[in-house]
Swiss-Prot record:
InterPro entries: MARCHF4/9/11, MARCHF4_RING_CH-C4HC3, Znf_RING-CH, Znf_RING/FYVE/PHD. It is found in: Golgi apparatus membrane. The RING-CH-type zinc finger domain is required for E3 ligase activity. Residues 126-136, 352-366 have a biased composition (Low complexity). Keywords: Golgi apparatus, Membrane, Metal-binding, Signal, Transferase, Transmembrane, Transmembrane helix, Ubl conjugation pathway, Zinc, Zinc-finger. E3 ubiquitin-protein ligase that may mediate ubiquitination of MHC-I and CD4, and promote their subsequent endocytosis and sorting to lysosomes via multivesicular bodies. E3 ubiquitin ligases accept ubiquitin from an E2 ubiquitin-conjugating enzyme in the form of a thioester and then directly transfer the ubiquitin to targeted substrates. A zinc finger (RING-CH-type) spans 155-215. Pathway: Protein modification; protein ubiquitination. This is E3 ubiquitin-protein ligase MARCHF4. It comes from Homo sapiens (Human).
């Protein structure tokens, strides 16, 4: 019995001595530092648990817009402002809601004695609910001012006339009304119209076919001349017209010299030169046809170049002058009445009520119906002049929408 007991005591003594020696060999400062860190962390953990579990829950702030606050949002709002600490900049989740509260007067400030924090001392800053309500009121006022300014700008933009080419207002320059068009395509800037004429090569409106009243002031300095953009087809047309003109001049000059010169008498008697005369005559006819065919295109290109390299002044549309010009044109062309009678049928109702367009400008002017007859006469003369207008490509009746889009997209 004594031997096992002695062995057990011997084993216990050896273990104690071994642990003691290990404690002597281990670095004491490092072990003490680890123990101190562990104690500090445990103490901080217990303090945090005491703060979050043993404190009383704060009262939920009343909503400013009068609607009951959702339970999820009220459950999240559990951290009040803690004076000048790290929680003073925290805002409740009520500000994140998508709805904007209506502007209401801010609540009266609380007395200093009633504003206390959870630890019994006076708070140094107002609660988070007051700060959030003030910020929401400022945000609502700013939104209201922005909406008012946007509405006023839209209203003023709808009343302000715009250029039908660049879609800018009078701040970019003086707006003119150079043709009969009305509505949103009535006004345009003078530089925009000159640039449009230089790109299109036509000096009349493509909607109402009214020829712009443009006065040439002066030509620019040759050092300031600008080149216009040409397509491949336009370049070929210009080259063909120039080469055809040069060949025609040279050929006609040689034919005239060989026909009337005494020194070329032997050429006129030679068979080979007689064949050349026939070939040159045929080539001259071809060149004349080429020049006639490409002449209008080259003339439009020249007018485009002239619009860019000359200073112009565009006049506004004068309705009275336009009507006078149409009446004068109707008097100088009396044969237009017969052509309109063949193209436009008349009816008994038009004859009884208003003068028909085919009755001629003299009868329309003497009819007692007044301004209506003048309008009929004006539109009839305009229609006739548009048919008699030379070297102008007429668009089909269904292409008016395309023309409007071309005007508005430049």
């Amino acid at each position: 019995m004594l031997m096992p007991l002695c062995g057990l005591l011997w084993w216990w003594w050896c273990c104690c001595s071994g642990w003691y020696c290990y404690g002597l060999c281990a670095p004491a400062p490092q072990m003490l530092r680890h123990q101190g860190l562990l104690k500090c962390r445990c103490r901080m953990l217990f303090n945090d648990l005491k703060v979050f579990l043993l404190r009383r829950p704060p009262q939920a702030p009343l909503p400013m817009h009068g609607d009951p606050q959702p339970p999820g949002l009220a459950a999240n709002n559990t951290l009040p402002a803690l004076g000048a600490g790290g929680w003073a900049g925290w805002r409740g989740p009520r500000e994140v809601v998508g709805r904007e509260p209506p502007p209401v007067p801010p609540p009266p400030p609380l007395p200093p004695s009633s504003v206390e924090d959870d630890w019994g001392g006076p708070a140094t800053e107002p609660p988070a609910s007051l700060l959030s309500s003030a910020s929401s009121d400022d945000f609502c006022k700013e939104k209201t001012e922005d909406r008012y300014s946007l509405g006023s700008s839209l209203d003023s933009g709808m009343r302000t006339p715009l250029c039908r080419i660049c879609f800018q207002g009078p701040e970019q320059g003086e707006l003119l009304s150079p043709c009969r068009c009305d509505g949103s395509v009535k006004c345009t800037h003078q530089p925009c119209l000159i640039k449009w004429i230089s790109e299109r090569g036509c000096w009349s409106c493509e909607l109402c076919y009214y020829k712009y009243h443009v006065i040439a002031i002066s030509t620019k300095n040759p050092l300031q001349w600008q080149a216009i953009s040409l397509t491949v087809i336009e370049k070929v047309q210009v080259a063909a017209a120039i080469l055809g003109s040069l060949f025609l001049i040279a050929s006609i000059s040689w034919l005239i010299w060989s026909t009337f010169s005494p020194s070329a008498r032997w050429q006129r008697q030679d068979l080979l030169f007689q064949i050349c005369y026939g070939m040159y005559g045929f080539m001259d006819v071809v060149c004349i046809g080429l020049i006639i065919h490409e002449g209008p295109s080259v003339y439009r290109i020249f007018k485009r170049w002239q619009a860019v390299n000359q200073q112009w002044k565009v006049l506004n549309y004068d309705k009275t002058k336009d009507l006078e010009d149409q009446k004068a044109g109707g008097r100088t062309n009396p044969r237009t009445s017969s052509s309109t009678q063949a193209n436009i049928p008349s009816s008994e109702e038009e004859t009884a009520g208003t003068p028909a367009p085919e009755q001629g400008p003299a009868q329309a002017a003497g009819h007692p119906s007044g301004p209506l007859s003048h309008h009929h006469c004006a539109y009839t003369i305009l229609h006739i002049l548009s048919h008699l207008r030379p070297h102008e490509q007429r668009s089909p009746p269904g292409s008016s929408r395309e023309l409007v889009m071309r005007v508005t997209t430049v």
